[in-house]
């Protein structure tokens, strides 16, 4: 103890430097933790907001063992099978793809979710209309009632709400029927 106190007295600069480095490393770790948490949230916030307690994928056909939203296609027969399973209250299909949306001179990359009209509070109620997340509406500079284009088709903005992100792109919800037509036309 005596030697440590004597070292502190005679080498103050060294101990201040070491203490400063430890404090800066602690601050850096805190910043990096916040950054990774924010990036993770922006990557999957729309998926986390999906109402339900399970998500079902089809078996990958491309030889991989990991299912993904972009490769999974659940047939109507598979959907009916899951609906009949014990403990399942309901089954809702959802389509997920990535594309570009346009409104006037504004263009932005977006994630498009095809959902049933009763899927969530912000789901569009009819074909030809879309629900935009707040970031998507800001990027396209549109509000409720404006029109946007996705893959050459025009849609009316019915709702602007939420902070949905998927794969670091803002989310647009459209009806499942519109999404299936868009998906078939673009191969998405």
Describe the predicted segments one by one.
Residues 1, 50-53, 87, 106-108, ...:
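Short glycine/proline-enriched coil/turn segments at helix->beta-strand junctions
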Residues 1-29, 40:
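N-terminal Sec/SRP start-transfer signal
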Residues 3, 34, 38, 174:
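Charged, alpha-helix-enriched surfaces in structured cytosolic catalytic cores
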Residues 5, 44, 145-147:
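Short, acidic/polar N-cap/turn motifs at the starts of alpha helices
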Residues 27-108:
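Hydrophobic, regular-secondary-structure patches
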Residues 102, 110-188:
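Basic-flanked hydrophobic alpha-helices used for secretion and membrane insertion
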């Amino acid at each position: 103890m005596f030697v440590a106190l004597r070292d502190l007295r005679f080498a103050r600069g060294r101990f201040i430097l070491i203490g400063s480095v430890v404090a800066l490393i602690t601050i850096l770790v805190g910043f990096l933790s916040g950054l990774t948490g924010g990036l993770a949230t922006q990557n999957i916030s729309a998926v986390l907001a999906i109402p339900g307690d399970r998500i079902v994928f089809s078996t990958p056909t491309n030889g991989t063992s990991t299912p993904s939203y972009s490769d999974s296609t659940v047939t109507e027969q598979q959907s009916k099978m899951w609906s009949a399973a014990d403990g399942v209250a309901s089954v809702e299909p959802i389509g997920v793809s990535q594309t570009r949306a346009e409104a006037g001179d504004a263009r932005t990359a977006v994630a498009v979710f095809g959902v049933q009209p009763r899927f969530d509070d912000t789901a569009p109620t009819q074909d030809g209309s879309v629900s935009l997340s707040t970031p998507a509406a800001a990027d396209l500079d549109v509000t409720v009632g404006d029109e946007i284009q996705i893959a050459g088709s025009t849609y009316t903005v019915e709702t602007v709400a939420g902070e949905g992100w998927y794969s670091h792109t803002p989310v647009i919800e459209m009806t499942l029927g519109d999404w299936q037509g868009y998906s078939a036309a673009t191969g998405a």
